[in-house]
Amino acid sequence: MASLSRVLRVAATCPRGRAAWNLGLQPLATEARPTTEKSVPYQRTLKEEAQGASVVPQGPSQPLPSTANVVVIGGGSLGCQTLYHLAKLGVGGAVLLERERLTSGTTWHTAGLLWQLRPSDVEVELLAHTRQVVSRDLEEETGLHTGWIQNGGLFIASNQQRLNEYKRLMSLGKAYGIESHVLSPAETKSLYPLMNVDDLYGTLYVPQDGTMDPAGTCTTLTRAAVARGAQVIENCAVTGIRVRTDDFGVRRVAAVETEHGSIQTPCVVNCAGVWASKVGRMAGVKVPLVAMHHAYVVTERIEGIQNMPNVRDHDASVYLRLQGDALSVGGYEANPIFWEEVSDKFAFGLFDLDWDVFTQHIEGAINRVPVLEKTGIKSTVCGPESFTPDHKPLMGEAPELRGFFLGCGFNSAGMMLGGGCGQELAHWIVHGRPEKDMYSYDIRRFHHSLTDHTRWIRERSHESYAKNYSVVFPHDEPLAGRNMRRDPLHEELLGQGCVFQERQGWERPGWFNPQETAQVLDYDYYGAYGNQAHKDYTYSRLLGDEYTFDFPPHHHMIQKECLACRGAAAVFNMSYFGKFYLLGVDARKAADWLFSADVNRPPGSTVYTCMLNQRGGTESDLTVSRLAPGTQASPLVPAFEGDCYYLAVGGAVAQHNWSHINTVLQDQEFRCQLMDSSEDLGMLSIQGPASRDILQDVLDADLSNEAFPFSTHQLVRAAGHLVRAIRLSFVGELGWELHVPRASCLPVYRAVMAAGARHGLVNAGYRAIDSLSIEKGYRHWHADLRPDDSPLEAGLAFTCKLKTSVPFLGREALEKQRATGLRRRLICLTVEEEVPMFGLEAIWRNGQVVGHVRRADFGFTVNKTIAYGYIRDPSGGPVSLDFVKNGEYALERMGVTYAAQVHLKSPFDPDNKRVKGIY
């Protein structure tokens, strides 16, 4: 039997593109022969795609029902978990259709690893539920063992930044009661004697991590689901999705078609894995994912490896999974092989392993566990996996088709995320929204212009695959799929040193570096596939400089922008914002129902408000301006009958807002429409004590407090161009937003800059907004304000019209919450020591962990680190203001605690004078 070291020698001498097994290493090839590997649930012939399909039994495993409440397509991990959780929620008439047999496609050959700690609180919760389902719930319900093995997990750090990341994970784990330990190299050696620790800085050990058996888990899931009335039908390929259009012109799912008949249903769940895009096309739904080859090898027996924890050596981009008395070795490479033509006939097929691609993982594995150099290879597994543009799954209801849900694109994490995601998807289907904040997985996180853009999907999916094991730094940005959407000021700001961030395809200003130009170049695939890697790439170098959990090297440049805004004025290009018009005969009714605040004030008023879901969770925060009819239609005042409201929403979440509003309009059958003018209008925000003096030279309007109060808007002329000026602030200063027709953006910007030159006006970006807004206590949606947070918990009760009798979406939930008391509450904490924090730090109160930080940044005006997070009472009681005030607090950063002071109001300008122009 060939050893791993021989593979390295052969690969080193083998010409590029030539198969290593042509040199006589037949045992290393995935040839067509029977296999009975433990990880393979069925005795099949493993073949390349070109060698043909496995034999498929004729006819479905049981008769098709004529109707179903829900049809799940795909019998892999997500399909089985979703069916199980639908059944647990009491959904009758739930049917799972599998083209071949359960686990076919990807699930059957997955490694089945479960790691409990990830740099996301929501993912930690999802993983915890999966672990509970496979390690306890299923066995209690069915009496069957799922194949769960708890052997622990070990993360390897071979540099200080990686160890810092692990310390952050350890602190987050304390908020969830997850046991973990940061070990020294010597302690690691004691735990794992076969490991080379000479190059280690340390490790993170999580004793209760483990592995799952895909076949055992899926079999047990479906048995439990069937016991609750669900149906599982194998050998039944879906051939089409029938769609109907209702009386309001809304497309809805009507039926699922198969070769053996159709099933009428209002709801379809696409859990088809690498075939999900094809299923989406059947219904006219865009599914942005790509299929790639993903591989691991299984070694021969290794003496002394039994009971060792699974290992992730992130810096070597390799994992080592315990498999009895052997190891599975796999990882993520910079040059994965795309599966260009996804075959329908590949249910239990495997590809031949490309040793040129896989060799790098062997090198990393041998370095970490040297005994592998002399260990033989028992088998290779190279199968298809689906990957997405941001390495997050695709879930939720498709914006193109009501009743069509996604549960696909799991980036090799479908087993470990399956339980949590299956539960949330079931809630999504039954209740309209998930229980947790699933925005990072929601298909609506992508702008509709990107979800069928082939180049963008391919580039971003490649980069997310290649960086799967990279450290997750706070200020990282993608290099792939850039320059998709640029506003009219892009080139102007680039020439002034703007370092851009990417959000929903938009290039938005991050911060300014006047010393050099940082153009974002076309994606080079990190030099893979014959591409020439960029040299002297300024933008990439600036990003790399910020790869730290300390204060970044450009910290002082963000400081200059912030202090200029507080002391004089700054201009923020916010043109990437979503800008919608809600108009029509029922627009007022829709506004009453959609918005938590009373927006039905006289035309000329602007209101900060939230949009809620049925459970009272916050789906959005935004500003709504009521408009008066114009004399003629324009980008600033569309023609309308009835009422019209102008909505300005964060650009990073604009598609989510658009979809949420349209869903509510459809459900309530309001006779109004939502018009998207995001590309037609730019947006400049001029903020600071000098903003009035600057703009008074540019605008033809009286900007005094009496003539132009806070939270009002007017149509004015700026340097001769008609604009909408709104007196608002995202940073806690006197200031105005200018909403400008696209063609006028550049001349208006130049006029503002010219007028501001003598007042000290500077360009500033979103890094400055992050710091300035946290000082003032303004919320950021999807950070300290999410769909699982109510406005009452978040300190935003003032945005809710609870003192009126006007019904609005989520009102009943808020009234119930107010009556029973808040079980958690958002608090503000500051740390006297100058220490960087970015979120996920544990919050200690009186010696107990009571929560974790959602959002943190450094406040340059107060010269302190500021953190916001939700806390609970460990006894389970309501969290009152007295509970908040009467505690001693500390924040744990990377295992070190820092004393913290709690604030009931924002630490900067708590009396709210500056936005009123009182300095």
From Swiss-Prot:
GO molecular function: sarcosine dehydrogenase activity
Transit peptide: 1-22
Pathway, per record: Amine and polyamine degradation; sarcosine degradation; formaldehyde and glycine from sarcosine: step 1/1
InterPro entries recorded: FAD-dep_OxRdtase, FAD/NAD-bd_sf, FAO_M, GCST_C, GCV_T_N, GcvT/YgfZ/DmdA, GcvT/YgfZ_C, TrmE/GcvT_dom1
Keyword vocabulary terms for this entry: Acetylation, FAD, Flavoprotein, Mitochondrion, Oxidoreductase, Phosphoprotein, Transit peptide
Location of Phosphotyrosine modifications: 778
Main location: mitochondrion
Enzyme class: oxidoreductase
Localization in the cell: Mitochondrion matrix
GO CC term (a single one): mitochondrion
Gene3D superfamilies named in the record: Aminomethyltransferase beta-barrel domains, D-Amino Acid Oxidase, subunit A, domain 2, FAD/NAD(P)-binding domain, Probable tRNA modification gtpase trme, domain 1
List of residues that carry N6-acetyllysine: 174, 560, 776, 803, 885, 905
Requisite cofactors: FAD
Pfam families cross-referenced by the UniProt entry: DAO, FAO_M, GCV_T, GCV_T_C
Record flagged with keyword Ribosomal protein: no
Catalyzed reactions per annotation: (6S)-5,6,7,8-tetrahydrofolyl-(gamma-L-Glu)(n) + sarcosine + oxidized [electron-transfer flavoprotein] + H(+) = (6R)-5,10-methylenetetrahydrofolyl-(gamma-L-Glu)(n) + reduced [electron-transfer flavoprotein] + glycine
N6-succinyllysine modification, residue list: 38, 174, 278, 378, 392, 535, 803, 885, 905
EC numbers, comma separated: 1.5.8.3
Cofactor detail note: Binds 1 FAD covalently per monomer.
Modified-residue entries (Tele-8alpha-FAD histidine), positions: 109
Role summary: Catalyzes the last step of the oxidative degradation of choline to glycine. Converts sarcosine into glycine.
Family stated for the protein in its record: Belongs to the GcvT family.
PANTHER family according to UniProt: AMINOMETHYLTRANSFERASE, SARCOSINE DEHYDROGENASE
Protein name: Sarcosine dehydrogenase, mitochondrial
Gene source species: Mus musculus (Mouse)
